[in-house]
Amino acid sequence: MAIVKMKPTSAGRRGMVRVVTEGLHKGAPYAPLLEKKNSTAGRNSNGHITTRHKGGGHKHHYRVVDFKRNKDGIPAKVERIEYDPNRTAFIALLCYADGERRYIIAPRGIQAGAVLVSGAEAAIKVGNTLPIRNIPVGTTIHCIEMKPGKGAQIARSAGASAVLLAKEAAYAQVRLRSGEVRKINVNCRATIGEVGNEEQSLKKIGKAGANRWRGIRPTVRGVVMNPVDHPHGGGEGRTGEAREPVSPWGTPAKGYRTRNNKRTDNMIVRRRYSNKG
């Protein structure tokens, strides 16, 4: 894919940068793999806001994506690459030799007509899924499981990938894009290559309305609120922040570490912030 800078024919188009989608399927998605997706607008069952800045936006169907890739030994042909409004990555529709169709995260470089296979005997080829024990050290991988059979949880967004650094007994060491090195069970599966649509991060939406289409509402600065609404609020005129930047609930907002899962601490070999002091 490539990016294109739009001509400034209006205020909303000026500065807009979008990803060219010429190779994507233009028709409707595959209906049997669609599910209803309800919008909660960031509210819980009591109507209370649990996630701020959410609401509105276009209606979507959820595309059921196969993150397990457990149909072993059966070749699958890539029918088409599609846009998915629920994620930054594109998705590929696979048609297996037995006629079943499934969506997967589209790896970089995959095009319609490619043949993919999953299983321990699959070749080391972009788009194929294997147990980590069968993948050579130094291979770039994505869609990585954290527990065998649970389905991919790591490196699923556009342009994401990880590198297999080492394999020792029951665990392998994988370096993530953040710099974190993590232990993964060698029976977990991963897909060869990196996720496509890597230029997603270069996109510029151009106008506030484009965020509203995505269901993202405006973000109000705490310093312009009242004291009852935010720790930064209040004062006569422009007062600035009278304390270190914090969230509306008083949690430090700049670099404060919030991880609190001692149960899996031993699975992290190197922290992602180890070089940040």
UniProtKB/Swiss-Prot annotation:
SUPFAM superfamilies to which the protein is assigned, alphabetical: Nucleic acid-binding proteins, Translation proteins SH3-like domain
Domain of life the protein comes from: Bacteria
Segments of skewed composition (Basic and acidic residues): 229-244
Region (Disordered), start-end ranges: 37-60, 223-265
UniProt key word Protein biosynthesis: no
Keyword list, A-Z: Ribonucleoprotein, Ribosomal protein, RNA-binding, rRNA-binding
Basic residues bias locations: 50-60
GO molecular function, one term: rRNA binding
Secretion signal span: none
Family: Belongs to the universal ribosomal protein uL2 family.
Its job: One of the primary rRNA binding proteins. Required for association of the 30S and 50S subunits to form the 70S ribosome, for tRNA binding and peptide bond formation. It has been suggested to have peptidyltransferase activity; this is somewhat controversial. Makes several contacts with the 16S rRNA in the 70S ribosome.
Protein name: Large ribosomal subunit protein uL2
